[in-house]
């Protein structure tokens, strides 16, 4: 039975991958999660925030395109290495057992070749920048590789993910300024770190039952019934860092209006999410693309109307 037929049998609509891509490349597109762009958005937003705060309007579209390209391919590489390390675990989890490496649609060796290709394409686009930016991008890769292993050794893999996924805030600064400017990059990095702890803890609640059986650790299992208390504090850290960052660079008042809207979105997530419902956890997780977009818009408008 084809993947498209399987999805229809389960009542799911086939993604654009099944509709438009040749059969031979579909497993690789699924391995990179190309039909689920939320991960690319979450990796891209810290870079977009940094670029929006620094770039002149004329170069902004080009810079966003470059870092958007980087985010898609590096996120894809992250998904590939995650699935490579987790292929035996994924077979035991209902939500992940059909992934290409777990199901056997892609062999481990071919998965590693696909990983190398994605890294080459993702890092190659940054070659046009200064040596510091390229070096930071290369240093980032071991963090991408190590993240899947953190789930085996600590209940805080989400914190490690925060370190890794916030990297774009540093890259945006180094690409445009030639250095990591603390007043610009650090508040954005810290806010993204705490934001990651919020949304990925919510995400981890989708699989907490299967994860506990498989021996996979997460903040969802660590916090348990106290999850909302923990992620409320993380949310305060996120908004606090964004507030401080705005003050440091003396951004315009409209930024704070958008920050208030983003705060409302984050409060809505935290206080309405049903942590016992994998479906609701998934929806709240995906809604974070809008949190990132609101902050990005606020930075732009705050710069235009100081």
Swiss-Prot record:
Cell location: Endoplasmic reticulum membrane
Keyword RNA-binding annotated: no
Tissues in which the UniProt entry reports expression: Expressed only in roots.
EC class of the enzyme, as a word: transferase
Catalytic activity entry: 4-hydroxybenzoate + (2E)-geranyl diphosphate = 3-geranyl-4-hydroxybenzoate + diphosphate
Keyword annotations: Endoplasmic reticulum, Magnesium, Membrane, Transferase, Transmembrane, Transmembrane helix
Keyword Membrane among UniProt keywords: yes
PROSITE patterns: UBIA
Topology of the protein relative to the lipid bilayer: Multi-pass membrane protein
Transmembrane residue ranges: 38-58, 61-81, 119-139, 153-173, 178-198, 229-249, 251-271, 285-305
Molecular function terms from GO: 4-hydroxybenzoate geranyltransferase activity; prenyltransferase activity
InterPro entries for this protein: HB_polyprenyltransferase-like, Prenyltransferase, UbiA_prenyltransferase, UbiA_prenylTrfase_CS, UbiA_sf
Requisite cofactors: Mg(2+)
HAMAP family, alphabetized: UbiA
Similarity comment text for this entry: Belongs to the UbiA prenyltransferase family.
Name of this chain's protein: 4-hydroxybenzoate geranyltransferase 2
């Amino acid at each position: 039975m084809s993947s498209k037929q399987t999805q229809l049998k389960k009542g799911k609509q086939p993604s654009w991958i099944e509709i438009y891509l040749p059969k031979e490349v579909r497993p690789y597109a699924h391995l990179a999660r190309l039909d689920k762009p939320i991960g690319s958005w979450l990796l891209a937003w810290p870079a977009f925030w940094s670029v929006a705060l620094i770039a002149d309007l004329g170069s902004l579209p080009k810079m966003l395109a470059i870092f958007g390209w980087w985010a898609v391919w590096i996120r894809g590489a992250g998904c590939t290495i995650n699935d490579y390390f987790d292929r035996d675990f994924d077979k035991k989890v209902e939500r992940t057992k059909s992934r290409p490496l777990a199901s056997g649609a892609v062999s481990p060796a071919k998965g590693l070749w696909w990983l190398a290709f994605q890294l080459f394409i993702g890092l190659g686009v940054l070659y046009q920048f200064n040596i510091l930016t390229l070096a930071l991008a290369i240093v980032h890769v071991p963090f991408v590789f190590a993240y899947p292993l953190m789930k085996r050794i600590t209940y805080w893999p989400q914190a490690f993910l925060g370190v890794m996924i916030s990297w774009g805030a540093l890259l945006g600064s180094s690409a445009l300024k030639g250095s990591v400017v603390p007043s610009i990059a650090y508040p954005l990095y810290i806010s993204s770190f705490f934001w990651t702890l919020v949304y990925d803890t919510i995400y981890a609640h989708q699989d907490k039952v299967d994860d506990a059986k498989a021996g996979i650790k997460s903040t969802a299992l660590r916090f348990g019934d106290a999850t909302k208390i923990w992620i409320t504090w993380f949310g305060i850290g996120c908004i606090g860092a964004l507030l401080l960052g705005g003050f440091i660079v003396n951004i315009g008042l409209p930024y704070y209006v958008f920050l208030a809207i983003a705060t409302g979105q984050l409060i809505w997530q935290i206080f309405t999410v049903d942590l016992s419902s994998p479906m609701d956890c998934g929806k709240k997780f995906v809604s974070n693309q809008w949190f990132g977009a609101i902050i990005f818009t606020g930075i732009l408008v705050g710069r235009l109307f100081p």
